[in-house]
Structure formats: C-alpha cells, structure tokens
Amino acid sequence: MCGIVGYIGAQEATPIILDGLKRLEYRGYDSAGICTLLEGKADKRRSEGKLINLERLIQSTPLAGRIGIGHTRWATHGPPSERNAHPHQAGSIIVVHNGIIENYLELKQRLVTSGRVFNSDTDTEVIAHLIDDKFAGTGDFERAVREALAEVRGAYALCILCEREPGVLIAAKQGSPMVVGLGEGEFFVASDIPAILSHTREMVFMEDGEIVVFRDGHPTFSTVAGAPLDKKSRHIDWSPLMAEKGGYKHFMLKEIFEQPRAVQDTITGRLLEEQGDVRLEEMKLADEQLRGIGRICIVACGTSWHSALVGKFLMEEHCRIPVEVDIASEFRYRNPVIDSKTLLLVISQSGETADTLAALREAKARGAMTAAICNVVDSSIAREAHGVLYTHAGPEIGVASTKAFVTQLVALYLFTIRLGRAVGTIDCEQGRTMIGGLLKVPALLEQALETNEQVERIARRYMNARDFLYLGRGMNYPIALEGALKLKEISYIHAEGYPAGEMKHGPIALIDENMPVVVLVPKNSTYEKVLSNMEEVIARGGRVIAICSAGDEAIAKKAEVTLEVPTDGEELAPIILSVPLQLLAYHVAVLKGTDVDQPRNLAKSVTVE
C-alpha cells in the first residue's frame, strides 16, 4: 500500500532512497518524505503529491548523511498532507511505517495523558512517541523498540532511526512486507524488491514478528521478543518489471493473490468482537442518524454496481430497510424520489467516477444523507460525501477490478453490521457470529486461490468458445454478472450473467454444445433450485462449469467440469466465489494473448460522463 526504503552504508543515502521510492511509484501514493542522520542530527524533507515535489525540495535544500529512511504514503489515517507525510519524529526517534495500528487510539490517549503532543493525524506518529517514551526510560534504542512493539496491535513494516544512536538502523515486520538487501559494506531495507534491485540481488525476506538491527557494518536478525535468528539470503534474478509485479506475470494476477491481505487490511481495527459491533468512525453517521434512515439508495457503476447488488441483499435481510440499487449514469436522469430520510450510498474504487460523483451531488442537493465506499483516500467522492468507508485494498493497477471488488463486498458487510446494531435488528450475539464469519474470509480466500492451476486447465479447454453464460441465484446472481464482466473485459469474449431462474425466459434458446455455462451452485437456500436449472442446461447439451461448495459429490457427477471452493455460509459465499471467476477470466485472456492489465478501450477510472 505504501512504500518504504532504508539505507545504511558508505554512500550518500538520499539519492539511493529517492531512486528506490521512484521504483515504488507504481504502488500509488499521495505524499512522500525522506529523513537522514548526519552527526547525530535528523534532517527531514516531506511533501504532498508526487515525488517530483519532494525531489525539487531536496534540490533546493539538500539532505546529507549516509544513513536514512524514506516513504511514499497512501493515506489510511488522516488526509494527504505534508504534516501527515512520513517520516514522523518524536523526540530523538524517527519512523516510517506501512500498515495499520489497531490500538493506536488507546495508545495515543495514554501518551497524550502523559504530556506528549502530536503533530499529525496518523497512527504512525503514535509508534514514534511510544518508542521515544520507552527510550527515555531505558536509554537503549533497540530495547525501546522491542518494548514498544510488544504493546502494538496491528500490521506494520517499520524503519526506525534514533538521533542518540546515529549509526544504527532498525527494521521490524508484522503483517506488512519487508525485505533486506545485502550489499558490499552497505545494507538496504524496502517494502518491495523493485526499490533495491538495482543495488543488490541478495535478499533476506523478513517474516512476521521479526526485527533486524543494522550496527557496526552488519545486520542482526531476531524475534521482537529477542530470540536470535539465522536468516539465509536468496539471489533474485527478476527483471525490474517482474519485480514490480512481485514475480507475477501481470498486475491483475498479483492483485487476485493479494485479496486475502486486502480483506485483512479492510477489517483490521474495525471489529469489536466482544460487543458484536464494528467501528466505522469515518462514516460520521451516529446511531441516531442511522435510526432515522427510511430508505437506502446505493449508486455505482460497473463492478462497483455488482457489489451494490450484494449489499442490497445484506441490508434488507439484516436491517429491514428498503434498499434500491441504481446505475449512476441512469440515476440522475430519472428524477428519483429522495428526501432527508434517504441515505444515498455511493461506491467507487477511485472515488473519481464522474457519473457516481454527479449522482452524489444530486442527492446532496435534494437533502439526502450521503456516504461513500471508496478505495482512494481524499478522492473527490470521499471529500464530498458526508462520510466514507475506506476499503484498504491498496493501489489496483490492473484495469479489471479484483481486490477492490472483494473489499467492497467486505465493506458492505461491515456497514450492514453497524447499521443493524444501530437500528436494533442485529443483536450482540448475531453480530459476534457475523464478525466471526468475516474473520475466516482471508483464510477461505487463500484456499480458493489454490484452484489456480485447475482453473488454468479449464481455461485451456474452453478458451475458443465464442459465448459464455453465467448463472447464479440470490446473492450469487451479482457474482455471475461480475464473472461475465471480467471475461468480456479482458478476453473480449461475449459473456452474459443471468439469474438462474430467468434462464427459461430467453437465454435457454442460446444453449447448445458450443456454449459453456458457468453455474454458481454453492450449498445455500437456493441450492435445489439452481441444481434444477443446471439440469435444464445439461438436457440441452450445454457444457456446464459448476462452481460449488467443497465436497459436493452430487454436482461433480452432473457437471462437465467442477470447481470446489470453501463456501462458509450463504452470505460470505459471494466473496469466495469471486476468486475462481477472476482466475478463469485471467487465464482465458492470457491464453488468447490479450493485454490483461490494460484491455482495449477501457480506463481504470472513468472520469467523464
């Protein structure tokens, strides 16, 4: 999500760090900064916007020093600004950080009570103050870091400097990537390989709960608790472009495989397990306002519209509030009925989708409450809505959305719990059950990703088909729509998603031995109905690709091809079922030789109406 680069050695640190940050630009960012140490004094340069702004700042006021840390920030706590940009300093401690600290508010309140003053809105500054607080008591930099991290909950990749120990660089990892590069008398730290690949190909990959201390010309690895580790380096032969993609052939495949982490980042710090509730402070909707909602309109475009359709099922089922779902480009031209008891919820990955932004403005003008689900912090939609729920998917480079879609589904699930608790339709026990289900999702996604090789074989079998039909019922109908959209977006094969029960009202006329039909048939309340629809396809010679719950032998006996995934409960199944559909579209497109990451005629963010 963010980029980190650290250096300690005989060369000037700033050019190396700046070059590394440039090589991480593909990850997306909204601000950047560098800090070096020279003669025990920290010197920082930070700027909002692109790296060119930071570069110009450094050209006008150079940074000297042979030890330093740098960062590109994708905002999660606090809007993009110079004061929220990293590095952050508290006393003699300077920190750059990727990740999300779950208990930062609790730690911050304690530190403020003890007299500490904060200068930013970030969770990262809390880490700097906490380490400095420990350092004030121990006078030992390394010990202070270990003691501070013992109190931190959440995900982090950290690079830390101390003015009082200017020859030491410390890095730590928990839940966010961190790699160490080994050079000749010099060492590099980065959040991703591309940042340092031009300097060394000898890498040590840190694991969760590990810390590395660079002192006296060599690194010492250990656990945060202090147990020594014998880490082995690996030689990396990747090209720079391969490194940006994490070794994957395309950004889209990389982003498909990032989904477990993206979901974890989206729920981290938001779940109140004991209370059976969730914390969504950035939505700025108090319980009293939520109880005043008479109707919800969800407005979106493309993939986001498909997630909105799933949200309708969730909210009506659990919150008993009527929900309408509109395509943004249609919404503003039909004179919709909107009043002060209407909540307009818009969904946009980029936060800049022109039609969705126009719908938001229309609803605000009519007096509706407004909220947004966005991935990009401080985007136009995020700024103009009354409140926002950010999906922490990180930058999505591939035009065809994958991890942004899945995190939108998770965000809608979170909002459903919050709304249901506020209006009293979800009690504490039910909230705990729903949260328990959410906590399983990252692991279930990991299992679904294990079908990748099987999906590739299926893609090879059906890649020359001219048309595909995707069928689903209930909450899985929008997933059928999304699967069809993915295939047509990147493989240029015509595909349609349809409610399985509507097949006999038209599409059944198209079915023959040349048409693959992808049927979503997990074990749920409509299982028997979908099974019947599948039989109708088979009776007409259709070639059924069935995606079903793990262990469903009945489906395996009927379908031409079966893909089993771990669908844990009816309401979480849409999230898991998305994975094999994404993989199918991806592998068909690769086999057909299309431009997977930048398909023809499409743009990542549609900023024109």
Curated annotation (Swiss-Prot):
Entry keyword set: Aminotransferase, Cytoplasm, Glutamine amidotransferase, Repeat, Transferase
Question: What is its subcellular localisation?
Answer: Cytoplasm
What cellular component GO annotations does this protein have?
Answer: cytosol
Q: Which residues form the Glutamine amidotransferase type-2 domain?
A: 2-217
Q: What is its EC number?
A: 2.6.1.16
Reactions the enzyme catalyzes? D-fructose 6-phosphate + L-glutamine = D-glucosamine 6-phosphate + L-glutamate
Could you name the active-site residues?
A: C2, K604
Q: Is the keyword Repeat assigned to this protein? A: yes
| Quaternary organization | Homodimer.
Its annotated function is as follows: Catalyzes the first step in hexosamine metabolism, converting fructose-6P into glucosamine-6P using glutamine as a nitrogen source.
Q: Which HAMAP family match?
A: GlmS
- Protein's name in the database: Glutamine--fructose-6-phosphate aminotransferase [isomerizing]
The encoding gene is: glmS
